[in-house]
Amino acid sequence: KDKNSKIIIGDKSAVLFQDELLRVKKNKSKEIKISTNTKVVILVVFKPSHLKNISSSNITKIKNIYNVKKPWGYEKWLTGSTNKNYAFKKIFLKKGSKTSLQYHIKKIETNFLFSGNAKLHYMFKKIPLKKKNFLKISKSIKTKIIKNGSVINVNPKTIHRLEAISDLMLFEVSSPHLSDVIRVSDVTNRPDGKIKNEH
């Protein structure tokens, strides 16, 4: 920290509050130091090769996080709505709610369950993925209780759904295919893809 208690980042400083984010541009920073007098949780998303030749002049504070309303809670797109390299989301689900039973054609995602308990509905079995096969699909769905600290990797064509046993907070890192959502079943009958009135 400097004498005014601002966090020093090389030759730059920034004060971060809850839900704020710093972005480090590819191949620019060597070291990030954080000083705090309260407990904080820091999530870092990067490709290993991006840690070479980093300079502090390419660290920026994200001011406008993209917010998306959902019937089950909300998403905060921490990397914005136009990042072509990857997506990083903070996701909140209300207790008792559930996401669509869905799969993706291209999108690959990893979810970190930060707080709360959930029931994961999933299926790896290869069944022709069409909505008219829902009865066949539903008989093959497995469930598993997951708790905070769990990590879920979802590959393309894996049917999945999260059901919130308690309020849930999770972080998702994925490929940038954010409209690639095929909804096999949805409580509110939402169609496939991006829902305009949520944005």
Walk through the language-model features, giving the residues of each.
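Short acidic-glycine-tyrosine-enriched beta hairpin
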Residues: 6-29, 124-157
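A short, N-terminal "cap"/entry segment at the start of jelly-roll beta-barrel domains
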Residues: 14-18, 26-89, 94, 98-100, ...
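A contiguous, mid-protein "functional segment" used to position or interact
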Residues: 160-182
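A short, compositionally biased micro-patch
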Residues: 2, 25-27, 35-37, 94, ...
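Catalytic cores of nucleotide-enabled group-transfer and carboxylate-activating enzymes in metabolic
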Residues: 102-109, 113-118, 122, 133, ...
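Short, conserved beta-strand element in jelly-roll/cupin
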Residues: 1-5, 91-94, 103-126, 173
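Beta-strand/loop edge motif enriched in small/polar residues
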Residues: 157, 176-178, 193-198
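Structural motif
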Residues: 4-6, 41, 98, 117-119, ...
